[in-house]
From Swiss-Prot:
Pfam families: Phospholip_A2_1. Residues 121-133 are annotated as: Important for membrane-damaging activities in eukaryotes and bacteria. One of its GO terms (biological process) is negative regulation of T cell proliferation. Gene3D superfamilies: Phospholipase A2 domain. Its main location: secreted. This is Phospholipase A2 homolog PLA2-03. SMART domains: PA2c. GO terms for molecular function: calcium ion binding; calcium-dependent phospholipase A2 activity; phospholipid binding; toxin activity. CDD domains: PLA2c.
Length: 137
């Protein structure tokens, strides 16, 4: 479990409910899958540094933009509730902010799953100085 936490921290840096995002990815994709994204491309990990290198990197870019749009919420600290129903992630709770944070994490998790075939090992630990200016959110 400690490894999962470290991987989650690498995945989104200081953004979001790291434990929950890491758990969500782990549950959706299996053991060890989350660590593939810790330093991937220009947008996975801490900061948003450039144009996405591929569809997998775009998942991280879209996730960070999703957080950025949550102006009345604090995705860095807001914890949320979610469950699995018939293989689908279901965001719960009555608080609109935490539900929106959950929806951002859910979208990222599904994006990673749906783009597994675009994952390219050459971007696994990508030098950030090669990243070009990021696209606007």
């Amino acid at each position: 479990m400690r490894t999962l936490w470290i991987v989650a921290v690498l995945l989104v840096g200081v953004e979001g409910s790291l434990i929950q995002l890491g758990e969500m990815i782990f549950q959706e994709m299996g053991k060890g899958a989350a660590k593939k994204y810790g330093l991937y491309g220009c947008n996975c990990g801490m900061g948003r540094r450039g144009r996405p290198q591929d569809a997998t990197d775009r998942c991280c870019s879209v996730h960070k933009c999703c957080y950025k749009k949550l102006t009345d919420c604090d995705p860095k600290t807001d914890r949320y509730s979610y469950s699995w129903e018939n293989g689908d992630i279901v965001c719960g709770g009555d608080d609109p902010c935490t539900k929106e944070v959950c929806e951002c994490d859910k979208a990222a998790t599904i994006c990673f799953r749906d783009n597994l075939d675009t994952y390219d090992k050459k971007y696994k630990i990508f030098p950030k100085f090669l990243c070009k200016k990021p696209e606007p959110c």
